[in-house]
Curated annotation (Swiss-Prot):
Residues holding [4Fe-4S] cluster: C91, C97, C100, C179
Catalytic site positions: C407
Annotated region described as Disordered, given as residue ranges: 1-22
Ligand binding (S-adenosyl-L-methionine): Q283, F312, N317, E333, D360, D381
EC number: 2.1.1.190
Protein name: 23S rRNA (uracil(1939)-C(5))-methyltransferase RlmD
Transmembrane segments: none
Pfam family membership, one: tRNA_U5-meth_tr
GO biological process terms on file: rRNA base methylation
Record field: catalytic activity: uridine(1939) in 23S rRNA + S-adenosyl-L-methionine = 5-methyluridine(1939) in 23S rRNA + S-adenosyl-L-homocysteine + H(+)
Listed CDD domains: AdoMet_MTases (cd02440)
A single GO molecular function term of this UniProt record: RNA binding
Family that this chain belongs to: Belongs to the class I-like SAM-binding methyltransferase superfamily. RNA M5U methyltransferase family. RlmD subfamily.
């Protein structure tokens, strides 16, 4: 499971007493290279500048966003000599919106940046590189995002409702009604959403809006005050026009306006339908998700008579496809509601060779009832902080093959050190381009017992 992230934040080493640079100050800079998060790096008077929107070799004018010690964070506002790599951003808001940080970089260069980040982490932290590099797993660079959270805030001073996405490094809202990374089905919903919300009777009591595209479209509204009958009519008419489900989140858990409706997505390759609820983790990129599952199963090479373990199983995104191919899948997840949902998904897909367990995967596995029979192979998909306690114990399970899906190359590299200690070798690794137009890196690694 994973884990949406938006870039690294660099902290100074030690307790520097260098005077702080005022926020808003402008500075002319020459960018020396790119950081792993896609920001340009420049050096001025002993300070290191991290500049969003800048490319290596460019001379830019940057506005300071903040500073701490000898580290300055800034945003490029003027480009004096553009890199040959620079391209026009597809979105007019790319410079301010916090959603996309590298739209000015061609997609193949984005992939190269992510590949470099993974390789550097494995080399510097674990001291290894895989026996073979896999080609980047990617899909369309725009129109891929099937889920989005839209920020909504009442501006009391201006007496208007702000609707859009959060600005980079800020709580400000960038007014947006068109987002090129959203799937096409959500574009008209996003276009008309601000005007609809401004018709509601208590705009100051509105929270965020979530948009979903899967087996059906859905719009979820977070509201902090009861909705009037006229509000419900406006919301229902809007959703009916877009053929979308309406979900409301007041007190308690989010609920569909029509209790018979549910959210879900399909894994077409395996003829599977997975149901979920708002708040459950679902990969936002449907195409890359399906390709990721296929690659994980190809690398794991499960045999029909094998017993396979899926750790951090979530809704069953890997466990259910695995169950199509092996004798038994044991799937473990830390969140009890997700365990219940995964078991329901297995039952609704007529899969009876799966067992699901809730467990704290930061604790020893030896006492777990599901760990005593051993496994031929293990798949794990941990959150950003990795799976250090788990990998320390994997050798006791007897698995010969292990596929690790990571949303954080730093913790993958750290855990690789431990897996090598446990007697595994790194056979293959590659990036998963789950979030084009951002510097966020997901990765997959195959380990085999020596």
């Amino acid at each position: 499971m994973a884990k949406h992230d938006r870039g690294l934040r660099f902290q100074p080493a030690g307790g520097s007493r260098a005077p702080q640079i005022p926020v808003g100050k402008k500075q002319r800079l020459t960018i020396q290279r790119l950081a792993n998060d896609g920001r340009g790096i420049a050096f001025v008077e002993g300070r290191t500048w991290f500049v969003s929107g800048a490319l290596a070799g460019e001379e830019v004018e940057a506005r300071v966003l903040g500073s701490h010690g000898k580290v300055v964070e800034a945003r490029a506002e003027r480009i004096f000599n553009a890199s040959d790599l620079r391209r026009p951003a597809a979105c007019a808001h790319a410079g301010r919106c916090g959603g996309c940080s590298v739209q000015h970089l061609p997609h193949d260069e984005q992939l190269a940046l992510k590949q470099r980040m993974l390789a550097e982490q494995l080399s510097k932290v674990a001291g290894v590189e895989p026996e073979a590099w896999a080609a980047p797993l990617s899909g369309p660079e725009f129109g891929y995002r099937r889920r989005a959270r839209v920020a909504v805030r009442w501006d009391a001073k201006g007496k208007q409702l702000e609707v859009g996405f959060r600005a980079a490094g800020s709580q400000d809202i960038v007014a947006i009604d068109d987002c090129p990374v959203l799937v096409q089905a959500l574009q008209p919903v996003m276009n008309r959403l601000p005007a609809m919300l401004r018709r509601l009777s208590k705009p100051q009591a509105l929270g965020h809006v979530e948009l979903f595209s899967g087996s059906a479209l859905a719009v979820l509204l977070r509201h902090m005050a009861p909705l009037s009958d006229s509000d419900l009519t406006i919301l229902k008419d809007f959703c009916d026009f877009h053929q979308a489900q309406l979900w409301l989140h007041g007190e308690g858990e989010p609920q569909p306006f029509d209790p018979s409706q549910a959210l879900g997505y399909r894994l077409e390759t395996w003829d599977l339908h997975l149901a979920y609820r708002p708040g459950d983790f679902v990969q936002v990129n449907a195409g890359v998700n399906e390709a990721m599952v296929a690659q994980a199963l190809e690398w794991l090479a499960p045999q029909a008579d094998e017993r396979v373990l899926d750790l951090f199983c979530g809704l069953g995104n890997f466990a259910l496809p695995l169950a199509r191919q092996v004798r038994e899948v044991v799937a473990v997840e830390g969140v009890a509601t997700m365990v219940a949902r995964a078991a329901e998904n297995a039952a609704s897909n007529n899969l009876h060779n799966t067992r699901f367990f809730q467990a704290d995967l930061s604790q020893p596995l030896s006492a777990a009832e599901w760990a005593d029979e051993g496994f031929s192979a293990v798949l794990l998909d941990p959150p950003r902080d990795g799976a250090f306690e788990v990998v320390r114990q994997l050798a006791t399970l007897g698995a010969k093959r292990l596929v690790y899906v990571s949303c954080n190359p730093a913790t993958l590299a750290r855990d690789t050190v431990e897996l090598i200690k446990q007697g595994y070798r790194l056979k293959r690794a590659g990036i998963l381009d789950m979030f084009p137009q951002t510097a966020h890196v997901e990765a997959m690694a195959l380990f085999e017992a020596s």
